Regions:
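Residue-level "edge-of-site" marker
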Residues: 17, 40, 77, 119, ...
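Active-site-proximal beta-alpha loop/turn segments in soluble metabolic enzymes
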Residues: 146-162, 188-198, 302-304
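Non-cysteine beta-strand/loop elements that form the S-adenosyl-L-methionine
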Residues: 32-40, 74, 116, 143, ...
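Structural motif corresponding to the early beta-alpha repeats
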Residues: 41-167, 178-179, 229
């Protein structure tokens, strides 16, 4: 298995749903060896209905290596894999068992990081066509438009119910992850608001992340630190949160993006026009001992770009490459 603790701070091409010639060439032409997959909507590579199987995971990792790439992490099983566990519904123990099997299979296949979230209804936006710099299109969120949205489930769910379900889940999963040698990386709620459609969103603040790390207290449990989601919470908390968690070795990888504005209203942005000085973010990660990988994550939709936003991703990764070179030289 890839020893993530022995590698330097580095860039990765991320949010891939499949490994194809386009993705391979994109990474190689940018000089990036490390990659990450996001399987939130499923994937041709990992076709399971309840869990991911060992041979499928092994084939994916081997295909990456055959292409000269290193598979660092997979994030987000399809939410149907564990929605009963998230809501504490009948059948949650069976779903937890399937998730345990998935993590065991990832370990056997030599995939070191599994990124996950606890956002029952996923990512919410109220617009996908807001205009950013130069007419590029970005997603945006305005809490006023959805604060009273109808229930997405049969009833409301409180903070403490969701915390109880999270505690039950993570304490069942972590021992398996430790045994399998897999690191679990928790992503914030996006948007980080108190509730949506009657369901509490608990991974929304610095204090709540401290609580989550205390509940799941293990060297194999840490953060997928999404800078954009933390910036949505409060731009002023981003650097203190990095110092706190990175100094403890709790940041396993980073979604390196930003937004303009904070909850209750924000829009996504190019990497150099958001709330934060992203070079200071990169420098703080380095100074705090972070040695994981950084990926570009969400990017604006530039004119005449591909469906995967190759132009916009290349712009973001180019900016990130220069920042990383500068912090390494210093």
């Amino acid at each position: 298995m890839l020893d993530i603790h022995q590698l330097p701070m580095r860039l990765a091409v991320g949010q891939l749903n499949q490994l194809n010639d386009e993705a391979i060439l994109f990474a190689k032409q940018l000089g990036i060896q490390d990659i990450q997959f996001n399987m939130y909507h499923g994937s041709v590579h990992l076709p399971g209905e309840e869990q991911w199987e060992y041979m499928d995971l092994l084939r994916l990792r081997t295909a990456c290596e055959d292409a000269g790439l290193r598979l660092n992490a997979i994030e987000n099983v399809p939410i149907k894999f564990y929605i009963k566990a998230m809501l504490g519904l009948p059948g949650r123990d069976e779903q937890i068992e399937h998730m345990q099997n998935t993590i065991r299979n990832m370990g056997r296949a030599g995939i070191p990081i599994f990124g996950y979230h606890w956002a029952i209804d996923g990512v919410w936006r109220t617009s996908s066509t807001t205009l950013a710099r130069g007419g590029a299109k970005v997603t945006a969120f305005d809490y006023a438009e959805v604060q009273n949205a109808p229930l997405t489930h049969e009833r409301p769910y409180s903070d403490e119910e969701i915390w109880d379900n999270y505690t039950y889940y993570i304490q069942a999963i972590l021992p398996v992850a430790e045994e399998a040698g897999v690191h679990l990386a928790l992503h914030p709620d996006d948007p980080p608001v108190p509730q949506l459609a009657g369901v509490a969103r608990i991974m929304r603040s610095f204090d709540n992340f401290k609580r989550a790390m205390e509940i799941g207290n293990s060297p194999n449990h840490g953060l997928d630190f999404c800078v954009g989601s933390w910036s949505e919470m409060d731009a002023d908390v981003v650097l203190p949160a990095i110092r706190h968690f990175a100094s403890q070795g709790k940041i396993f990888y980073v979604h390196f993006r930003d937004v303009l504005g904070t909850v209750p209203k924000f829009r996504e942005a190019f990497i150099n026009e958001g709330n934060l000085d992203m070079f200071e973010v990169m420098k703080t990660l380095k100074e705090s001992g972070f040695n994981g990988f950084l990926l570009d994550d969400h990017v604006p939709m530039m004119s005449n770009d591909s469906g995967w936003n190759n132009r916009s991703r290349a712009f973001a990764l180019g900016q990130m490459s220069v920042m990383l070179d500068m912090v390494n030289r210093n």
